[in-house]
Structure formats: structure tokens, C-alpha cells
Swiss-Prot record:
Residues 66-79 have a biased composition (Basic residues). It comes from Periplaneta americana. Keywords: Biological rhythms, Nucleus, Phosphoprotein, Repeat. Gene3D superfamilies: PAS domain, Single helix bin. GO terms for molecular function: transcription cis-regulatory region binding; transcription corepressor binding. This is Period circadian protein. Disulfide bonds: none annotated. SMART domains: PAC (SM00086), PAS (SM00091). Residues 1-11, 51-65, 600-614 have a biased composition (Polar residues). InterPro entries: PAC, PAS, PAS-like_dom_sf, Period_circadian_regulator. Phosphorylated with a circadian rhythmicity. Residues 1-83, 592-614, 645-716, 731-751, 784-803 are annotated as: Disordered. A motif (Nuclear localization signal) lies at residues 66-77. It is found in: Nucleus.
């Protein structure tokens, strides 16, 4: 990022702040010489100090030329940023160097100083146009402390001349005197108690200890080898740079030692200096208040983003440096505070670690900065990329109060550059109408996140990128007003200029018409007004969401209840089994109506449920069992015999005796709950014909024996066997229901047609039925006493001559002979449908018919009630609806 700083164009490119007493920065006044002969460190403004006397005069200077006068005039106008550090350092430069020289093989250096030998060094050409540097690395004894080698009396070799010789002699003499004084002070330190030691030699000890700590601490750590990174150590006392890594030259272009002794904030962009100072002030409070007794780094590591100055040398910009603009590059500064306490300090006491209690304690606090260059994320113009998501947050006033640092490579802005600015200023003016609709949805959703269509967002270089945003918001639950809006962004397309850190071009704003700009201002005000309104609670949407949740819950509960009802039905099964006999199931065709089923595997017709079919079947079987309550055995036998005679004539596909025996046995067994007998009625043993009585009795006895002793063992009944049995029975009962419904309707229509034909034939032949009071009384008597002996025989002549003819004809129509045998000429009809015929023609109450009534309906009733012998047990059965439903059971089984 390049920006113009007009006040820096006159400053030397070395970025050093020139103090008012910087006359010794250039030791040679000759403009022809390229080498620095200064005896003082350029980092500390080059002041020499004489140890023998109290004079602080500078070294002899050459004649001042016109160029030097101009330069000095310019330097006097500039403010000094390190005057305090320079003054404190000048008084200790010689002593520090002398101590270091004596400590590091000082004998050889002293011999050099005494003999006056000049050490030739390979000087380097300075890359500055105003200030020449002591070019070689050998000109500095310790780059970590920023002390020049020239103070020790070692100067680069130059062209012989009287000025150079005088300067060299003065330097060597000063060095020799410094070494002698340091020896004297060291000898006195062994005799003088530690309590009486003055500050005259404590400062050199601190300086030496600081130098050693810096060298040991930062040289032991691996330097930043990552591309675009370098490390800087800044003293927290005066903000002066005391250490840099060699990679600084590759990143910003400055030589390795050019930052030493300079204030770090001078290299920070002017607009970032205030934010940097505030960040350091807030971060340095904790390390100073909670100092580590043993030294070391503090855990508080934080980051700051700012722009650092680039180097303007001859190699990079050529001649005419003052006419070039000062450029800056964006960096991420990872800062750590490090405390270095002198290990040999005699005043260091355990528990007493405050900076005031340690001489020079404040000098031991350093700020370690690792600067990482931030580059643009785009390689070419209009690049389509999938960036990581970054977040911004702005208030209801549209002022940004949080910016994710991840956005810098994509937007080109530093976080503190966007904070406090209106987010509406970054939107494209033509997209503001669409964004107004987006903010309306934000107010309606009441905090629910949603994703909008892409829109354009301005980058630092003036171009626009394409963003896709997922919006959310927070509404104050008490004031019902919007507090802030959060946007999670993702870049879809880069700007036309790939370098987003470049300075914006002013001509880009001219591409948008004035009308669009005016309209955008109006829309911005509307958006601000919209966000300041009270958020309305959308009750309709909430009701819809609530109803949807209720429906989902109801569906879930229904499915859950279906699963729960299955074991509930199974648990009730043992209670129902005690009221029925397994013998009944065997005799009814191995069908057990005792169990209920929870699922009806029906066809598309959706027949009645299995529970309903089972219930109807149980009731029907109860009425068919003809329970004996107050009747005698003889009357029961007569009813069973009459029923057997009817049932045996209409059984198709099976022999009459077998069906009759099965029916009789079933009826007797169904009476067992009423009679209180577990093995059936005792009178049932003598019923039936002689040929089939024995077989029925043997089957009943065998089944009863098996039921009570062998076949039915409750402990052997398992759940798997019960479920399989229930499924089979369910299928069979549903199938019976279908067959009964289909066949029953066909046979009923056939029976009605046959009866209708016989009635028409009777009327055509003029048959007159003779009535008698005895016949009429028989009808009345049959309705009152269903167990009379009149229904014992199927005699067609019992009701009269006319009645007998009709009866025989009807018997032929139904396929039944008068003798009780199956008639071969006509299709057989199950016996239950004979009962069905009686039900259709017999009203549910007693009817007295007059013989002289000539109307066909009366003839129909008279015919039906007089000529067809009615079984005595059928006269009293009113709920005969179940008889018709149960008709196919006798045929299929």
C-alpha cells in the first residue's frame, strides 16, 4: 500500500529522527568521501564523551562546507524523538565498550589501541542520499545493543590525511583512558561494600547484562524463516529498537542495523500511530504490574494490524529519493512482552521484583514484535475464488463495531480502518435498493438467519468485489428494538484490480452518475430509519410455525401409539382364553376366535376390523349354541334333532352326518359356560341318529380329553407361537368375511327369485289355501312356544292340501327333499340360508293371518308361516342378523 507523506520527504531515508545535537552524525565533512568516520553510534546520535574530564565536547570536525551548512540547517528544524535515550546512552558508550572490550579478549584490543594501528575494514557504499552509514558489519561491536565499533577506537581505513590521522589518534586515546578507568573501578568494587556502590558503575553493569540477555535470549530462539516475516525487539523504556533479524532486508528493504537505536513508531504509518499507541498502552499494563521474578515472556500475546514503511534506497528508487512518495506495506504484528532481569544484580531479592527496586529495572522490559506481511488474496483481475467466511457486525446506526481480521486479504482494509465507519458507504450505490429489501427481511425474521443474493462491496483500491452474505440480527427483548446486525460473508468474485492494498483511484467515483448517488443517499436514510424502528412481533408466522409443530407432534404420537397398542393387546389375551375351550376351536375347523389382532391385513376393500369380526363371531356362536337354562333334556334333544335334520340336508361338499355331528358337538360345547359344566352338556350324548352318535361322542370325548390333559398346556404357550397363530386366524377370518359377503348376496337373490316364481305359479293355477283355526293357532302357538312338537316332522300335508303343494315346490326350488335328503336335481343351499329365508319372511313379532285374505302380501305371509315347518328354536331368535353373517363357516369348515 503506497501513500503520500509530505512531511517525510525531507527526512533521511534511514528513518532516523535527527536530534538537535546530531553534529557528529557525519564525521567527515568532505563530500567526496563515501565512508563514515564517525566515532559515535548513529543510533545514539554520535556523541562522544571524554572520561578524563567533564567536558562533553564533540570530536574535532573538519571544515564546514556549504553543503554541510544546508544539511545542518535542515536538521535543526526537525524534532528529535530519542533525545532522552541518546543523552542517557552517550554517557555510557565508552564505559560499556571498554567493559565489553576487556571482557572479550580486551588485551588484543588494547594493544591495537596503544600502538595506534588502524584496522582496515572493507567499507560499503551507503545507500542513503543524506546520511552515510558506517557501512561494514565490522564497524559495530554489538548490533544487539546498537553500539558502534568506532567508539572503541577501531575505524575504517581511509585515504591518509592530517584530518583522518588526528581523528584516529583521538579515538584511540579515548579508548585507552576508558579501559584504564574501568580497571580502576573494578578494583575498587572488591574493597567497597555493596551498600556503598554508587550508580556510576551500576549502569554499565545493567547495560552489559541487558546486552547479554538480549543476545542469549533472541539468538537462542530460531529466527522467523517464513517468507515475509521478521522480528524486532523494542525497549519499553524509550521505544527504541534494540534488535532486528536479518530478514527485515528482504521484507521492507532496510539494512539489518538501520533500525537499531531508532524509535519503532517512526516506521509506522501516521494514521496507524494512534491506534498502535493505544494498543501498546492497554497491553503493557499487565506485564508491568505482574512482573515475573525470574524473567521470561508473559503469556499475553496479541495481534495488531498496521502499515510499516518501505525502504527508499538508491537500489529501489534510484536518484531523486526526496521526490518519491513514501510507501507502506500492511503487516500483522504479533506482540509479546518479555522481561529480562540481570542475573548478577546484587540488589535482586526474592519477592522484591518491582521495577523501582531494581536499578535499571525498567530497561529490562522489552516488546518482541513478529511482523508478518499481508498480501492480496487475488492473483489476477476478476478472479473467482471461494474465500473463507468472515464476519462483520454493525449497529442499528449502520456503524461497524466489529470486523474480522480474515477479511484483510480480500477487502484490503485494516480492521481499525473500517471500525466506526458506516457500512452503507461500502455498498455499491446501485445495489442499495436491493439491500433495503434485505434489511426489511432482517426486521421481519426477528433474528432468524437467512441468506441473500450476492451484492457488490467496495475494496480498499476502489474496486468492488461480489459478496454472498448470511444475515442475522439481535433484538432487545425488552425494548423490542434492533441492537446489531451480523453478516457472515463469502467472496464470490474479486475486483478488477487484483492488488486490494493499493491506494484508491479518485477517477473511479466519477463512473457513477449523480442521480444514482443522490438516490443512494435517500435510500441510506431510509435504511437507517428502518433499522431504528421497533421490531413488530409477527404473530401470524408464529402461529403457522406452532400449528406445523403441533401437526408434526400429532403425527409422531399416532405412530407411537400404534406401536404401543400391539403389546397391550397381547397382554389381554390370557384373560380371554379362560372363558373358551380349545375343543371348540378344533371342532370349528381349527379356528380360534379367542384372540384379538391389532393389525388388519385387509385388501383395498377395507373390511371390518378383526376385533369386530371376532366379536360378531363370538355372539353368533353363543346364540347358535342354544343354551339350556330351564328346559328339560327331552326338549333340548328335540331341538337339536330338528336342527340336525335341517342342517344335514344343505351341506355341500361334505357328508351330512359329519357336519351334523360337528354342529351338534359345537352347540353342546357352547352351552358349557351357562350350564357350569367344563365338558359339555350331558344330554348331548344321546342326541342324533344311531349311525353318527357314536362318532360324534368319540370325537367330543377325545377332544375334551386332549384339551384337559395334553394339547392345551398354558406353560408351553410362547409369544412367538401366539403371534403366528393370531396372524393365521386373522387372515382366515378376513377371507371368510369376503366369501360370505359375495356368496351370500348371490344366494339370497337366487332364493328370492325362486320364491317369487312359485308364488306366481300358485296364483296362476288358482290354488286356494284352506285355512283352519288350528293352523292359525299353530302360528300363534309357535311364536309363543318354540319348543312344541309340531316342528318335528317335515310333513307337507300337515298344513292342508294347498299348503303341501307349495311346501313341496319350495323344497324342490331350494334343493331339499321332504325326506331330509339332498336333492340331486337342484343346487344345494346351506341350511343357514333356509333360516335366512325364514328371517326375511318372518316378522319379529307374532302375526295372525286370516285364511280369507286374498291379497298377495298376505298370501306370502300366510304361505311362509304355515307351509314351511319352522324349527321351534328359530321362532324365539330375534337377533338373527348374526346367522346370516356366519353362514359360510359351516360350508368351509
Amino acid at each position: 500500500m503506497e501513500e503520500t507523506a509530505t512531511h517525510n520527504t525531507k527526512i533521511s531515508d534511514s528513518a532516523y529522527s535527527n536530534s538537535s545535537n546530531s553534529q557528529s552524525q557525519r564525521s567527515s565533512g568532505s563530500s567526496k568521501s563515501r565512508h563514515s568516520n564517525s566515532s559515535g553510534s548513529s543510533g545514539y546520535c554520535g556523541h562522544g564523551s571524554s572520561i578524563q574530564g567533564s567536558s562533553n565536547e564533540p570530536f574535532p570536525q573538519p571544515s564546514v562546507t556549504k553543503r554541510n551548512k544546508d544539511k545542518e540547517h535542515k536538521k535543526k528544524k526537525l524534532k528529535s524523538s530519542v533525545t532522552t535515550a541518546a543523552t542517557a546512552t552517550v554517557t555510557s558508550v565508552v564505559t560499556t565498550v571498554s567493559e565489553y572490550t576487556e571482557h572479550e579478549n580486551g588485551t588484543s584490543h588494547m594493544s591495537l589501541g596503544v600502538s595506534g594501528t588502524v584496522v582496515p575494514l572493507s567499507g560499503t557504499v551507503a545507500e542513503e542520499t543524506e546520511i552515510t552509514e558506517a557501512g561494514s558489519e565490522g564497524s559495530v561491536i554489538s548490533s544487539h545493543a546498537g553500539v558502534a565499533l568506532g567508539a572503541a577506537g577501531v575505524v575504517p581505513a581511509t585515504t591518509p590525511g592530517p584530518e583522518n590521522e588526528a581523528h584516529q589518534m583521538a579515538s584511540l586515546t579515548q579508548t585507552l583512558n576508558s579501559i584504564k578507568k574501568m580497571k580502576k573501578m573494578k578494583d575498587l568494587s572488591t574493597d567497597i561494600p555493596e551498600e556503598t556502590e554508587g550508580h556510576s558503575f551500576s549502569l554499565p553493569m545493567v547495560a552489559e547484562e541487558k546486552e547479554e540477555h538480549i543476545r542469549n535470549s533472541f539468538d537462542a530462539e530460531p529466527p522467523a524463516h517464513n517468507e515475509g516475516e521478521f522480528c524486532v525487539v523494542v525497549s519499553m523504556q524509550d521505544g527504541v529498537v534494540v534488535f532486528t533479524t536479518p530478514s527485515i532486508t528482504d521484507v521492507v528493504g532496510f539494512p539489518k542495523d538501520m533500525w537499531l537505536g531508532r524509535s519503532f513508531i517512526d516506521f509506522v504509518h501516521p494514521r496507524d500511530r494512534t491506534a498502535f499507541a493505544n494498543h501498546i498502552t492497554s497491553g503493557v499494563i499487565t506485564p508491568l504490574s505482574n512482573s515475573n521474578p525470574k524473567g521470561g515472556s508473559h503469556p499475553g500475546k496479541n495481534s495488531f494490524y498496521c502499515c510499516l514503511r518501505r525502504y527508499r534506497g538508491l537500489k529501489s528508487t534510484g536518484y531523486g529519493v526526496t521526490e518519491k512518495e513514501v510507501s507502506y506495506l500492511p503487516f500483522q504484528l504479533n506482540m509479546t512482552f518479555r522481561e529480562l532481569l540481570p542475573h548478577s544484580n546484587p540488589l535482586e531479592v526474592e519477592g522484591n521484583t518491582s521495577p523501582e527496586s531494581v536499578p535499571g529495572g525498567c530497561n529490562s522490559m522489552f516488546l518482541v514484535i513478529t511482523a508478518k506481511l499481508i498480501c492480496s488474496a487475488y492473483k489476477h483481475a476478476g478472479e473467482t475464488c471461494a474465500s473463507p467466511k468472515f464476519v462483520t457486525r454493525h449497529l442499528a446506526t449502520c456503524k461497524l463495531n466489529y470486523v474480522d481480521p480474515e477479511c484483510m486479504p480480500y477487502l484490503g482494509y485494516l480492521p481499525h480502518e473500517m471500525l466506526g465507519n458506516s457500512v452503507l458507504d461500502f455498498y455499491h450505490p446501485e445495489d442499495l435498493p436491493f439491500l433495503k429489501e434485505v434489511y426489511q427481511i432482517v426486521m421481519q425474521e426477528n433474528g432468524a438467519p437467512f441468506r441473500s443474493k450476492p451484492y457488490r462491496f467496495r475494496s480498499h483500491n476502489g474496486g468492488y468485489i461480489l459478496l454472498e452474505t448470511e444475515w442475522s440480527s439481535f433484538v432487545n427483548p425488552w425494548s423490542k428494538k434492533l441492537e446489531f446486525v451480523v453478516g457472515q460473508h463469502r467472496v464470490l468474485k474479486g475486483p478488477e484490480n487484483a492488488d486490494v492494498f493499493m491506494a484508491p483511484v479518485e477517477d473511479d467515483t466519477l463512473q457513477i452518475s449523480e442521480e444514482v448517488l443522490k438516490e443512494s443517499k435517500i435510500i441510506q436514510e431510509e435504511i437507517r430509519s428502518l433499522l431504528s424502528e421497533m421490531v413488530k412481533n409477527n404473530g401470524h408466522l408464529e402461529k403457522q410455525q406452532m400449528s406445523k409443530r403441533c401437526r408434526d407432534l400429532a403425527t409422531f404420537m399416532e405412530s407411537l401409539m400404534d406401536d404401543i397398542t400391539k403389546p397391550d393387546l397381547k397382554l389381554e389375551l390370557p384373560q380371554e382364553e379362560h372363558s373358551f375351550s380349545e375343543h371348540d376351536s378344533v371342532m370349528l375347523g381349527e379356528i380360534s376366535p379367542h384372540h384379538d389382532y391389532y393389525d388388519s391385513k385387509s385388501s383395498t376393500e377395507t373390511p371390518p376390523s378383526y376385533n369386530q369380526l371376532n366379536y360378531n363371531d363370538n355372539i353368533q356362536r353363543f346364540f347358535e349354541s342354544k343354551p339350556k337354562t330351564t328346559l328339560s333334556d327331552e326338549s333340548g334333544e328335540s331341538k337339536i334333532e330338528a336342527n340336525r335334520s335341517l342342517m344335514s340336508t344343505d351341506e355341500e361338499g361334505k357328508s351330512g352326518p359329519a357336519a351334523d355331528s360337528s354342529l351338534g358337538s359345537s352347540n353342546r360345547k357352547c352351552c358349557s359356560p351357562v350350564n357350569g359344566s367344563g365338558s359339555g352338556s350331558g344330554s348331548g350324548h344321546s342326541s342324533g341318529s344311531a349311525g353318527i352318535g357314536g362318532s360324534a361322542e368319540s370325537r367330543r370325548d377325545t377332544s375334551a380329553t386332549n384339551t384337559s390333559h395334553g394339547s392345551y398346556k398354558p406353560p408351553l404357550l410362547t409369544e412367538a407361537l401366539l403371534c403366528r397363530h393370531n396372524e393365521d386366524m386373522e387372515k382366515k377370518m378376513v377371507q371368510k368375511h369376503r366369501e360370505q359377503r359375495n356368496k351370500g348376496s348371490e344366494r339370497e337373490s337366487k332364493l328370492k327369485k325362486c320364491v317369487h316364481d312359485k308364488l306366481l305359479q300358485e296364483q296362476c293355477h288358482g290354488v286356494k289355501r284352506s285355512g283352519s283355526h288350528s293352523w292359525e293357532g299353530e302360528v300363534y302357538k309357535a311364536s309363543k312356544h318354540p319348543h312344541v312338537e309340531g316342528g318335528k316332522e317335515l310333513n307337507p300335508g300337515s298344513g292342508g292340501s294347498g299348503g303341501g303343494g307349495v311346501t313341496s315346490g319350495l323344497s324342490q326350488c331350494l334343493g331339499v327333499a321332504a325326506t331330509g335328503k339332498q336333492y340331486s336335481g337342484v343346487g344345494s343351499v346351506p341350511p343357514i340360508f333356509q333360516g335366512g329365508t325364514n328371517v326375511n319372511l318372518w316378522p319379529p313379532f307374532s302375526v295372525t293371518v286370516t285364511p280369507l285374505q286374498p291379497t298377495p302380501p298376505c298370501s306370502t305371509h300366510g304361505f311362509a308361516t304355515n307351509n314351511i315347518p319352522t324349527p321351534p328354536h328359530m321362532a324365539s331368535m330375534i337377533p338373527v342378523y348374526y346367522i346370516e353373517k356366519r353362514a359360510p363357516n359351516f360350508k368351509n369348515n
